[in-house]
Each structure stands twice: as structure tokens, then as C-alpha cells.
Amino acid sequence: MRVSKVKVKDGGKDKMVLVHRKTTGAQLVYSGQPVSNETSNILPEKKRQSFDLSTLNKTIIKFDTAKKQKLNVDQYKIVEKIFKYPKQELPKQIKAEEILPFLNHKFQEPVKYWKNGKEESFNLTLLIVEAVQAQDKRKLQPYYDWKTWYIQTKSDLLKKSIENNRIDLTENLSKRKKALLAWETEFTASGSIDLTHYHKVYMTDVLCKMLQDVKPLTDDKGKINTNAYHRGLKKALQNHQPAIFGTREVPNEANRADNQLSIYHLEVVKYLEHYFPIKTSKRRNTADDIAHYLKAQTLKTTIEKQLVNAIRANIIQQGKTNHHELKADTTSNDLIRIKTNEAFVLNLTGTCAFAANNIRNMVDNEQTNDILGKGDFIKSLLKDNTNSQLYSFFFGEGLSTNKAEKETQLWGIRGAVQQIRNNVNHYKKDALKTVFNISNFENPTITDPKQQTNYADTIYKARFINELEKIPEAFAQQLKTGGAVSYYTIENLKSLLTTFQFSLCRSTIPFAPGFKKVFNGGINYQNAKQDESFYELMLEQYLRKENFAEESYNARYFMLKLIYNNLFLPGFTTDRKAFADSVGFVQMQNKKQAEKVNPRKKEAYAFEAVRPMTAADSIADYMAYVQSELMQEQNKKEEKVAEETRINFEKFVLQVFIKGFDSFLRAKEFDFVQMPQPQLTATASNQQKADKLNQLEASITADCKLTPQYAKADDATHIAFYVFCKLLDAAHLSNLRNELIKFRESVNEFKFHHLLEIIEICLLSADVVPTDYRDLYSSEADCLARLRPFIEQGADITNWSDLFVQSDKHSPVIHANIELSVKYGTTKLLEQIINKDTQFKTTEANFTAWNTAQKSIEQLIKQREDHHEQWVKAKNADDKEKQERKREKSNFAQKFIEKHGDDYLDICDYINTYNWLDNKMHFVHLNRLHGLTIELLGRMAGFVALFDRDFQFFDEQQIADEFKLHGFVNLHSIDKKLNEVPTKKIKEIYDIRNKIIQINGNKINESVRANLIQFISSKRNYYNNAFLHVSNDEIKEKQMYDIRNHIAHFNYLTKDAADFSLIDLINELRELLHYDRKLKNAVSKAFIDLFDKHGMILKLKLNADHKLKVESLEPKKIYHLGSSAKDKPEYQYCTNQVMMAYCNMCRSLLEMKK
């Protein structure tokens, strides 16, 4: 039963209950009110309804269970009525055998409870029979007494549990924390714990023999009653407990006082609950599984692993407490703030890793160490192997030819990333509020090794000014690349740009849904099946994709997204009337819908819990309320499967914005957006089309006005953040913007406006590629050579319809999808993938098939649209007959499917094949591979960031140490430096000088060498035993450090990287995270989810060495004509989300060794 983040009635009003934790204990409080202990007021009276439901569920089985067991459901309802509606009349007659199957196992036997200090018991089946025979409910009084006793006992336990849910620091530790601390010294010294004593005291061997003696119950068909068997195992454990802890009358005080024995016992309980669950579970044990899990050795080994994992987690928690300087006045609000900060830090760490990889590609693409490290950066500069052309791709101009100026430029980009990374890696308390306040950077020279340079005194100030001045050009170029200029008249575009003032920044209200979610949600609501459950939002603007050709649909999508983000959102989230109207409409329609579906339950509708927007509410106030409720509901339902239930507050917010955007688009000024028409002559050459587009772009530039309000080009901190943003791609910039918006809400006093504007400015040109090859290549041959690895050898691309060479037969065409892979360093990897299989290359056969398909594709799209409309009409006709309850069904939809279903599917497959060929001809598939690679590496870097965080917390736990680590450091390397270079001063050893300090902050000097050597030895032993689990194996220790660096620095993309495949790195990452089993297991799920997001089903399996291997990688399915995955295969009409050929490429990406 939940007592937190739920609503209760108090004084006639609904109030949200929260748990407020402190170091002295916890208490229930009301949300939005001064903190006051309401625990006794809420429990049990204000949760009476929940307690009643709890007792009902303990008494009888659930309705679904009765159906599943094929019991008499009518008889179930008769029995249920006795307990659920105690004021209603009893049934006229009932037999014991009609009651017993519906009682939970506990109530099928005599039930014991305590009344007035005396043990009582009753047989519920007999009570019911007697009560029915006498038609006297007073016969059920023993059951009502049990219910009163149960609620009071449960309530007292809940109160005690809440009170004990304190924040554990060093004082007032829980029994579990005390036990873990008792084992900690042994564990950190050896990397293991010896449980021999507790195996003996707990008599584990005896327990396992008792468990093995429990015989499974079978039905008349020989099928095991799993639930009854698992209850039997639980009963055996309960019978074993008195032998260890004694009974209430004769307790074993010594064992009961042993905290470690108590925790050992709890682990045994959890073991049985996990492998032999009584609650509904997907686990299905075979006979071999049962034999294995009931072995004494299996139980002992598992418990040891679980306890070791818990000890590590406790060490990390202690380090976290020390790191954040949590004191006795710490509350749950402080913990929420820390959690929010950590989420932001981890996200920003991944962003910094991506930016650092881009710096490495510019400065020294063979560097496998940390390019942001000062020593490694200097070594790379000395190679003088910088890539000025690549630098210009990011900043618009190449590096200076003057050596000093060039190095200042490079130190500037390093400083912009390195300082942000260092700030977030070592943040404490409120440090994140100033994480972006960077004005100077290291710029050492021979004469001044510690020289600092201000960003306002660099070339980056002029470049920032230039970027601000060119916003109209960037905006116009975005309209061109998005397809707006190709599919809308200049007159319409000019009218739109001059009539409305587009905002540089979208709304900064957190939880405002993104365009994709609103767009897809609107399409689903507007075009859903119009039956009795049709949800009417009176929408008009969300037209289906099938209504448009591919390119015109993309242009319309771009325009709608632009209008939503830069016009609608800023206005809608400040126009109180429009916002309130949408809120009121959605709530009204939701109530009407509930009444239509179930007229008897007028009070029960999905958004009943959402309070109306009052006249006193501002938009910000109301959204803050909705946001608070949404977060609470997310927490409440976080343990459920995501698809199992849709959160009402999330759905409410989505509908408000869907309706609001639909209303906004009804203005006549937007009519043209729904009717994209090609503006270029179809027969024109690619060069002619490009020239025409450039002319159209130039003609609207003057009208493209986006004016920044907060970004200042003379502010050094703004310039530094601008440099940082220029090193990111559009995906990372968008994610950073979204995270900043969310994070800003937790740090209200810190202003983010200028950061958000700078991000939006950089987004305008982030992934823009020059269209003239001369801006990127020194010759035509070099440009064409860039394409050759991806094209079939010997193919004559000069005859491929201006796809790769212009109509003059020699001028190359720039392909943005290729150039972006060059910019972000994945080109060599993509070449390797494509070279794995000749079918991966773009071939003459691909061109011929694509060229042929082009001639009929528009007609086929129209044919698919017509078929779909016919099916919708047939389905609606069937629904109408259903509503009219006609006896004889016409089955219009089924007849349509029988006649046209296969044709419809063939057309869909043909269109999908054309789209795949079109993607190959324009290298879109390479861009997707590039994006997937960056996401995979970024996700792995995110796990390494967690490893680094926990590494640091491990050190912070050793608060009494004379020396501390400030982050990840190769202790083996330092140890060698200390012992092999005795003549050097310690302060000259880079790693020690910068990574290790004394607690009091003094510099380490020669006089403490012996102490330092002993410290390093002790620290290495501590980490190797307790964290890395490599004992004294120096080779394995170094391998783990190398793997950490390999993943953290994106070394998978470098020329000199070690010979790893991505699946190898996933396995190595799991090994790195072995210290936290939950985190280790999360690795594979994270990558399965990532491929799912990209439209693929990734299945992994463990080989004989317990290493993950790819079992299969297949496309996800899209179901058509009302079919679903639940239908029999012969009734499924489905196509693939992605082509199998693309899945094969992605599998090569995973398995290919670099």
C-alpha cells in the first residue's frame, strides 16, 4: 500500500501526501503546506479505503485469477459481495465448497489474530456458512475483529517504518547499515567476506535440506501448482526461523541482537522471493532450475555476492554523503536537489566527451589519451599535425597561419570544454550555478607557462559578433535546407515572416511537450477509428502522412515544427487566454468522453484529478502545479511497465498542447502550410535547382529576423560558452538546451537566458554543410574520392542523374550526409562497414531500380492513400452495424482486406524499397549509421561517467586519509613514477601534482615522499580489492584503466585504437561496472533500448565465456489495416520499420573490430 505521493481527503479537500525525511527520522506531510508531522492523522483513518481494499485482497483471490483458473465467476461475485459490501444482504444460501476456491490460501485454514492481548482464531468458511444459514451478519464478527486488528497492526508497522526511514549519516544508523559497516573492514582489506560463521549459526545446510524436502503439489493432470509450491517453501523457511531467533515466548536474545545475522536472514528471504516468487511473475523454473537454486552452495554463494554488492553500495553512499557535506540538518529536499544535479552532471559529461573528441580530431587524431589533459594537449601540439580544414568546418574560418595565434585558438577551444568538464566532475553544493561562468583559459607560452587569456581578447569575440550578425542568413539557409523554399511560394514565406515575429528561443517551460510528440499525438487523435470510443478533440490540422509525397511531407513537417517551436510555443506559454481555453476544452471533452463510454460513472474520468485553471493562476503557476503532479505520478507508477498505463497528467499536458496548436494553425495565414507544392522544375538539372534555391534563399534573407535579447558578444563568459556550443552537433545542442530548461527549475535564482539563446544561435548553423565543393576540397578529384569508398567499384557515376556529378559531367555534388561524418570523425568507420559487404555499397543496380521506381512512386503513394481511405470507410461501416446491433454482419473491412489486403501490403513494401534506395543514393543510411554510432559511444561514455563518479565517492568515503584523489587516476602509473624516478621532485610528477592533494590543501613536497609512497600502496590495495576487484594483478589492473580511457575518450574512432568491436566494448564495460550488479545489468538493456528507438530489435545472448554476443538484429514491425502482433500470422498485415539490409549494416557496426 502506498502512503506517499497519493491524495487523501482532509477537511473536504484533496491533499497530496509526501514523506519528509530527516536524519532523525521521517514523517508524512502535506504537499504545498508548512512541514508538520501528519503521520498519525493520516494513518489509518485517511487511508481507510486503501486498508479496506488491502483486507479484501488478502481475503479473496482477484477476479482475473478466478477467470484464469476457470472458476465460476458468478459464484465469485456472490462471495466477493459478502466482504466488499458488508451492509448489503447476505445470499439466501451457500455451501462451503462454493466458498473455499475463492479464498486466499491463508483463509482456507483457521486464521489466528490477537484481541485484548489474547490469541483468537476462526474458520472463515464456516463463519460464512453459519451467517448465511442464520441470515445474521453478527456471525461474521470474528472476521471483522480480525480486520480491525489487521488494520491497526498494519498501521502501526507503517508508522514505525516511516519513522525509521531516516537519512542515514554517521549517527543513528539502521540495523542494516551497522551490519554492512561491520563487514566493511574485512571487505576493503581482502575484497571478500567470510560468511562461514553465519552459514553455521543460521544452519543454512539444514534449511536447504528442509526446502528440498518440500514436495510440489500437482493437479490431476500432473501439472505443478507453482504458487502452492512456492508458499510451501516460504512455510519451510518460517518453520526454520525459530531455530535461529527463538519464539516470542522464548527468544534467542543473542542471535536477535546480531545485526549481521539479521541481514543474512533478510538476504535468504529475498533469495526465495526472487527465485520462488509467490506474487505474479514471469519466472518459470524447470526441474533443473529448482534443484540448482535449492542447493546450499548456490544459496551461500548468491548471498555472499549480494552482501558484497551491498557493502560496495554502502561505501559509495558514505562517500556521497562526505562529498556533498551532508549534515544532521539534511532533509529529503537536499537529496532531491543532489539527484537533480547528478542527472545534469552526467548528461553534461557525455556532451563534453563528444566535444573533446571533435577537438582531438582537429588537433591530433592519433591521440588516444585525454586530449583535454594539459600534458597530452601539449604533446599533440608539438606534433604540429592540426587540421585547419576541419577547424573551419566548426568555426567558419581556418586556423591562423601565425603559430602563436593558432595555438591561442586551439588552447581556447580546449579551455571552453576542459573547464566545464572539470567543474561538473568535482562539483559540490551550489557549484553548478557557476559551471558556465568561464572567462579565461590556460594559454601557456615558453616565457609564461601559467599565462591566462581572456576570451574577449581572442578571435572568438569577432566570430561570435559575426555569428550574431549572420542570424538572418542562417535562418534563411535553414528554410532552404528544410525544404520550405522548395515547396512553398516566396510570397507565402515572405508574408509569414513579415506578419509574425519568430522567436529565437522556444518556450522555456519544462515539460512542454516537443513537436514530434504533439504532431504524432495529434495525428493519432484526429485520424483514429470513429467508433463509440473515439476521442473527440475536434482537430483539423493533423493530416496523415499518406496524404503527401515523401519530400512534400518532409517540407510540411519542417514548417510545422518551425511554427510550433519558434512561433506557437513562445506565444502559447505567455497568452493566458489561449492557454486557459485549451485547458478548459480538454477537461470538458475528457468528462464528456467518460460519460459517453460509461454513462453510469459520471464522476470517474481520466482528468478528474487535474484541478481547473483558476482566474488567479498564471500559466507558470498552473504548469508548476501540473509539473509537480506529473513528477509525483511518474514516481508512483515507475515500477509498472511503461506501456501498461499512460500517466494522466502527461496525457493531459499533451492534449492541451495538441488542441492549442490545432487552434493556432486555423488562422488563415497558415492555410498554405497544409498544401506544399513543388516550386522547382522537375526536369531541371541538380545544378539548376541548386542555383534557383540559392536565389530564392537570398530573396527572403532580409525578412528572416530573429533577434537575441540576452546573448552579449562583449561578455567573456558568453563567448566561452559560444565556443563550447560550436563544438557540438545539432543533437547534442538540442539535448543540452532541454536539460538546461529542466535544470533551471531546480536553481531558480540562476539565469539561463543567455545560454539558451547561444544554443539556439549555434543550432541555426550546427549541421549546415557548404554546397560548393571548393569550400571543402582543393580539387574535384579530392571531392569525388571522398564518395568512392561508398560506391560500387567501376560504377560510372557521371550518368547517375546529377546525383554525384553535375550536368557538366565533372563538377562534384556535395553530400551533407558524408561531410557530417567527416566533421564528427566517423568517416573511416563508415568506410570499414560498407567495405564489409559489396551489397552495402551503392551500386549501378541500385541506381537503375531507383530511377525506374521514381516514375511510378507518386502514383503508388496515391494508390496507397486511396486503399487506406477505402478500408477506413469499410471499418466505419462495420462499426455502425455494431452500434445498431444488427444480427447479420456485413464484414465490410474483412471483405476489403480479402480483396485488396495483399495489394496494399505490396504497395507499402514497394514504397519502402524505393525510400531505402533513395536513402542509399543520397547516403542517408550513412548519416543514420553515423548518428547511431555517436549515440552508442555517448551511452557508453555515460556509463563510464557513473564509474568515475563512484570511483570518486569510494575515495571520499576514506575521509580520514591524509591524501585524497580528485578523480580518476592511474595509481599503478603513479606508483612507478615514485619508485623509478627517485631523483625527481614529487611536485614535478604531473599526475601527483594535479590529482592528489593533502587534506589541508598544502603542496606535496620531498619531505613526505615515504609517507606518499605508503599512501599510494595502501590506496591501490583499497581500490583493487574493494572497487576494481583485481587483487594484485597489475596486468588486469592496467587493462581496466585502458578500457576506461578507451571508452571515455571515444578512442573507438581513432586510427591507433585497440582492436575492439562495439560488442567487445559493451562486454568490457560490463566488467568495469561489476562492482554494481544493477548497473552492470543495465548496460545491455540500455543498448537494446537504443536499437529499439532506431526501429530495430536487438537480441543478445551469453556465450560459454559469459560474454554477450549478438544473437539477432531485425526490424521492428509496423502493423496495417487494423492488424496487430497479437493476431495469428496469417491475419497480420505488417511491414518493416527499417530494411533488413540496414539491420545487417548495424550488425556489422556492432561486431566489426576496428
Curated annotation (Swiss-Prot):
InterPro entries: Cas13a_endoribonuclease. Residues 330-466 are annotated as: HEPN-like fold 1. One of its GO terms (molecular function) is RNA binding. Keywords: Antiviral defense, Endonuclease, Hydrolase, Nuclease, Repeat, RNA-binding. Target RNA acts as an activator for non-specific ssRNA degradation. Pre-crRNA processing is metal independent, while crRNA-guided target RNA cleavage is dependent on divalent metal. Its EC number is 3.1.-.-. It is an enzyme of class 3 (hydrolase). Residues 923-1154 are annotated as: HEPN-like fold 2. It comes from the Bacteria. Its cofactor is a divalent metal cation. GO terms for biological process: defense response to virus. Part of a type VI-A uridine-preferring CRISPR-Cas system. The target ssRNase active sites are probably within the 2 HEPN-like folds, and the 2 folds interact in vivo. Belongs to the CRISPR-associated endoribonuclease Cas13a family. CRISPR (clustered regularly interspaced short palindromic repeat), is an adaptive immune system that provides protection against mobile genetic elements (viruses, transposable elements and conjugative plasmids). CRISPR clusters contain sequences complementary to antecedent mobile elements and target invading nucleic acids. Unlike many single-component effectors, this CRISPR-Cas system targets RNA. CRISPR clusters are transcribed from pre-CRISPR RNA (crRNA) and processed into crRNA by this protein. Cleaves linear target ssRNA in a pre-crRNA-dependent fashion, preferentially before U residues. This is CRISPR-associated endoribonuclease Cas13a. The lineage of its organism: Bacteria, Pseudomonadati, Bacteroidota, Bacteroidia, Bacteroidales. The gene is cas13a.
